Curated annotation (Swiss-Prot):
Keyword list, A-Z: Ribonucleoprotein, Ribosomal protein, RNA-binding, rRNA-binding
Name of the protein: Small ribosomal subunit protein uS15
Organism field: Kineococcus radiotolerans (strain ATCC BAA-149 / DSM 14245 / SRS30216)
PANTHER family in the record: RIBOSOMAL PROTEIN S15, BACTERIAL AND ORGANELLAR (PTHR23321), SMALL RIBOSOMAL SUBUNIT PROTEIN US15M (PTHR23321:SF26)
Key word Transcription present: no
Amino acid sequence: MPLDAAVKKSIMAEYATSEGDTGSPEVQVAMLTQRIRDLTEHLKTHQHDHHSRRGLLLLVGQRRNLLKYMAKKDINRYRSIIERLGIRR
């Protein structure tokens, strides 16, 4: 389930490190988190949608790898994004 353009723009505006930033780890993690939340809501009503469940697991793995990278490169940015997104790690 792709994100709407308006949702993407609001996420980019909130988590961008500079003007026009679309690829920083913070923005990528925030986008993945929103998609994960949307898919989680979808799976609450469609429990037997195994294709979407697999997609959810892939997204969680991508986010985990990005967070691992952030923790290795700059622990303060990692802690900041974890707190801002409200995800436990």
